[in-house]
A protein has these predicted regions:
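Alpha/beta-hydrolase fold catalytic core
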Residues: 1-22, 43-47, 83-84, 110, ...
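Gly/Ala-rich beta-loop-alpha elbow adjacent to hydrolase catalytic centers
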Residues: 90, 94, 98
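Active-site loop/oxyanion-hole signature of alpha/beta-hydrolase fold enzymes
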Residues: 49-89, 252
């Protein structure tokens, strides 16, 4: 199992394929497993890296976690592996992190694809907003059926592949301890990228599912409004997980954007 020791902790990641590097970043309660099909598809032409953020999947850290920490984690990950620059693909919280990396370390990012990502934290489903409070998180972990019920509602409804998505998210969420559970979503809830977006000169693609009930899909309009070089792909039949709901089209859109000359 590939791991990397950074200043902040131990990072688990998976890599597949050959060619130019592409880095994939999962969302809240997720892990690299979200990208299992994507790294197989992109790995035909690219060297793909899918990492677990601290506190998720198999990455280890005992201290506080935050979106800000994850931005620095991606930078350190690239530095340690000798990746000079690369496109970043991020789902949900991972997309917010990807935009943060592009703003803080512009020389490292060629282009970004964000999928169902919040530009402002107020776009999160109320269940996610509440999860950012320690008291609520403690309650959820005291009564596990609360977490299971919330995951069921958020994943089963909205997308076409709700059953498969629920199984994947429930398995990943089972590995997450209370601290990263509420700390990461708490900092995501307070996110506001409106001031940073106009500074980004790289190509940005926002993929949003029309049936998303986890992050308001109208965030795509904010992206287009504030990012000078952004474009949007609208997935009519998808919820929060277009890579599950409309897999073939998703991979086609991602590949086309990656291959387009900047």
């Amino acid at each position: 199992v590939p791991t990397l020791v950074t200043d902040q902790g131990i990072v688990h990641y998976e890599t597949y394929g050959r060619g130019r590097p592409v880095i994939l970043l999962h969302g809240w309660l997720g892990s690299w497993a979200l990208w299992r099909n994507t790294i197989e598809e992109l790995g035909k032409d690219y060297k793909t890296y899918a990492l677990d953020f601290f506190g998720f999947g198999d990455s280890v850290r005992s201290q506080q976690v935050s979106v800000d920490l994850y931005i620095d984690l991606v930078y350190q990950f690239m530095e340690k592996l000798g990746i000079v620059k690369a496109p970043l693909i991020g789902h949900s919280m991972g997309g917010t992190v990807a935009l943060g990396v592009a703003a803080r370390y512009p020389s490292k990012v060629v282009k970004t694809i964000i999928i169902g990502s919040p530009i402002v934290g107020s776009s999160l489903n109320p269940i996610l907003k509440l999860s950012g409070y320690q008291r609520i998180a403690n309650l959820v972990y005291t009564f596990p059926f609360l977490k299971d019920s919330a995951i069921y509602v958020l994943t089963r409804f909205g997308g076409r592949e709700g059953a498969a998505t629920y199984r994947m998210v429930a398995e990943d969420a089972g590995k997450v301890a209370p601290q990263p559970f509420f700390q990461s979503i708490g900092t995501l809830r307070n996110t506001n990228l409106v001031e940073k977006l106009p500074l980004l000169q790289i190509p940005i693609l926002g993929i949003y599912g029309k049936r998303d009930i986890i992050v308001d899909p109208r965030q795509g309009k904010l992206l287009l409004q504030y990012a000078p070089s952004a474009q949007q792909a609208w997935f009519e039949g998808s919820g929060h997980f277009p890579m599950m709901d409309e897999r073939e089209r998703f991979h086609g859109v991602v590949r086309e954007f990656l291959e387009k000359r900047s």
